[in-house]
Amino acid sequence: MQLPLTPLSFSGTLLLMAMSNFLLWEHVTSSASPRLSTRNLYQRVVELSHCTHDLASKVFTDFNMKFGKSICRQKLMLYTCHTSSIPTPENREQVHQTNSEDLLKVTISVLQAWEEPVKHMVAAVAALPGTSDAMLSRAKELEERVLGLLEGLKIILNRIHPGAVENDYTFWSGWSDLQSSDEATRNIAFYTMGRCLRRDTHKVDNYLKVLKCRDIHNNNC
């Protein structure tokens, strides 16, 4: 028989999740050491990328359940992702036509565009009335994963393409909406952030699988 989670066991579960994430993140960020080969670093980054997208999907589910029902669907059409201005490959053919250096750089650009938003997202979630521990924990963990993934990719870029110049990334201006006293504006901001983060982590995950196949397995995968 499966026992319900008591407050203590629930806290323990969150702690185990946080520790698991910390160890995975540490594997990536400690990779500046020559002891971790580029092959192994790529493997760590791809694993982290998959976990990051999975977590982003869960965070979007949280936001959708909390804010989605009160949102006018017509209004959502007016809100685009702040990363939409970044020119990214949009289908399999375009991905395979993009050389590895450019694909890696655009992947970094997408993640860099989320560097500030995920930090503000955690603060905004923490300030929401009635926020559950689980929802806040997932938001914090997602921030750590995005930042860890970004750091790991920068290391890979410097190793494989030394001297490569990173692309510019898109400025995010959504902080005021997350803090808005207008509930509808705030709800749309949270919903849009969750939807766009899920979309972009999926892109990143797909790009990294292609890059790993090219750079590590010489397309034999």
Curated annotation (Swiss-Prot):
GO terms for cellular component: extracellular space
Localization (cell): Secreted
Entry's Gene Ontology molecular function annotations: hormone activity; prolactin receptor binding
Annotated SUPFAM superfamilies: 4-helical cytokines
Broad class of where this protein is predominantly found: secreted
Residues annotated as signal peptide: 1-30
Keywords: Disulfide bond, Hormone, Secreted, Signal
Protein name: Prolactin-3B1
Natural source organism: Mesocricetus auratus
